[in-house]
Amino acid sequence: MGGLSADGRRVRLVGAGLAALVLLAAPVALAMPRYRSQAIVQFHYDADNPLWELDRRVMACTYCHVDVGGGAPWNPFGEAIRVGFRADAEAGQKGKFPDVLYAVLKADGDADGDGFPDALEVFARTLPGDPDSRPDRPLAELQAGFAAAGGVAQYAPKAQKSSNSTP
């Protein structure tokens, strides 16, 4: 008689179960940390990539961290953000990441000391915490393009809707 033996059916069943498990686990394995996801949206890096949440090339962990896997230690840009959180807390605020990130960019700092302010590096899609990652356009040209695109204000956090606001 045709068909699979009991062992063959068992192997197929186990194989199908493993395939389903891999498919269900993939989104979790590919998920990005919340801060990185927020920064990608805030920097508009998601605009041209509908699958940005699954594409780690959109913003690597090394944007803020020394190690490719994230965690401590932080690079100079990541340290600037950490300092921003501390300053925010010392001022009695409950800093949300988008607000602290925007404050760091508005400060017009150059965390990695490469001659390009952090906000310009965000605009040019280079790494603001890595002095070896620099925009390929001259500073003046980059500044003009940045200003034409809206300057640092383009990275302002989206206004939060308040349930206490009156119409």
What spans do the regions from the language model cover?
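Short cysteine/histidine-rich zinc-coordinating motifs and their immediately flanking basic loops
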Residues: 72-82
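Acidic, divalent-cation-chelating loop motifs in proteins
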Residues: 106-114
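Proline-centered structural pivot motif
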Residues: 102, 106, 122-165
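N-terminal secretory signal peptides that target proteins for export/translocation
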Residues: 1-10
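Sequence context of c-type cytochrome heme-c attachment sites
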Residues: 29-56, 80-107
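Sec-dependent N-terminal signal peptides
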Residues: 12-20
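The canonical Cys-X-X-Cys-His
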Residues: 57-68
